[in-house]
From Swiss-Prot:
This enzyme's EC code(s): 5.3.1.1
Keyword hit for Flavoprotein: no
Name of the featured protein: Triosephosphate isomerase, chloroplastic
Subcellular localization: Plastid, Chloroplast
Originating species: Arabidopsis thaliana (Mouse-ear cress)
Family: Belongs to the triosephosphate isomerase family.
Database matches in InterPro entries: Aldolase_TIM (IPR013785), TIM_sf (IPR035990), TrioseP_Isoase_bac/euk (IPR022896), Triosephosphate_isomerase (IPR000652), Triosephosphate_isomerase_AS (IPR020861)
Quaternary structure annotation from Swiss-Prot or TrEMBL: Homodimer.
Modified residues (Phosphoserine): 178
């Protein structure tokens, strides 16, 4: 289904009606949060400004490189994945982007052995502790053994189809981090929660579960994926996505630290494709994407990676 922009969710134009648990100060100030953070958070990458691209710098609220992950989910065969790898290997990708793909577990070794080193590998899930008698699960140690550097945790399909709870997901993140994997920490609300004005409450509760469990945010990327936009063809407008990203950054500042808020990359997912990624990328607090279906098409995924160019401003 072709993606269409959802500029106003049905019967509700905002994100919140009545939600006592959300700090009032955070609500009133979240839209101006970016203007209060230190200008040093506007970076090309972790390198010094003397190495900036002559085309300009990347203006984004999270420090580090633009981040694009491809979640292949439960898709593919050996042959189709070989074709996808070939397309990715031949693609021209912007240098100032961290690129990660997440194949089904059974194909990770195939991907790792033939995919360009330019692209890192992620698991789609991991167990909450050391491996053992846990039928059907995948351990962090196994992912590392196959060369993975990241793992996706808290994806809505794990939360709402498999039934994983916030606290359990937080513990999984803590274990993965303790063993040296980076975590793509997913949060996001369902349509009925957005319509009820609970977007912030839901996202903040999911964030809190991560914050309560993890020892550090140094190797975490937060992925905001509104459930109503995943695989539906509906896409949050750039303004809708930006509003939530700013609120998430504000929550991190208030509840974790200003340093974590300024450093953490917050990426968007939910029917991102080659046609809408450039407009989404222009928003200052959208630090990249977590891509589903479009990541199964090599040329389109490359277009999404290269949408970082729309984020560049004159130095």
């Amino acid at each position: 289904m072709a993606a269409t922009s959802l500029t106003a969710p049905p019967s509700f134009s905002g994100l919140r009606r009545i939600s006592p648990k959300l700090d009032a100060a955070a609500v009133s100030s979240h839209q101006s949060f970016f203007h209060r953070v230190n200008s040093s958070t506007r970076l090309v990458s972790s390198s010094s400004s003397s190495h900036r691209s002559p085309r300009g710098v990347v203006a984004m609220a999270g420090s580090g490189k633009f981040f694009v992950g491809g979640n292949w989910k439960c898709n593919g065969t050996k042959d189709s994945i070989a074709k996808l790898i070939s397309d990715l290997n031949s693609a021209t990708l912007e240098a100032d982007v961290d690129v990660v793909v997440s194949p089904p577990f059974v194909y990770i070794d195939q991907v790792k052995s033939s995919l360009t080193d330019r692209i890192d590998i992620s698991g789609q899930n991991s167990w909450v502790g050391k491996g053992g008698a846990f039928t059907g699960e995948i351990s962090v140690e196994q992912l590392k053994d196959l060369g993975c550097k990241w793992v996706i945790l808290g994806h809505s399909e794990r939360r709402h189809v498999i039934g994983e709870k916030d606290e359990f997901i937080g513990k999984k993140a803590a274990y993965a981090l303790s063993e040296g994997l980076g975590v793509i920490a997913c949060i996001g609300e369902k349509l009925e929660e957005r319509e009820a004005g609970k977007t912030f409450d839901v996202c903040f509760a999911q964030l809190k579960a991560f914050a309560d469990a993890v020892p550090s945010w140094d190797n975490i990327v937060v992925a905001y994926e509104p459930v109503w936009a995943i695989g539906t063809g509906k896409v949050a407008s750039p303004q809708q996505a930006q509003e939530v990203h700013v609120a998430v950054r504000g929550w991190l500042k208030k509840n974790v630290s200003e340093e974590v808020a300024s450093k953490t990359r917050i990426i968007y997912g939910g029917s991102v494709n080659g046609g809408n990624s450039a407009e989404l990328a222009k928003e200052e607090d959208i630090d990249g994407f977590l891509v589903g279906g479009a990541s199964l098409k090599g040329p389109e995924f490359a277009t999404i990676v290269n949408s970082v160019t729309s984020k560049k401003v004159a130095a």
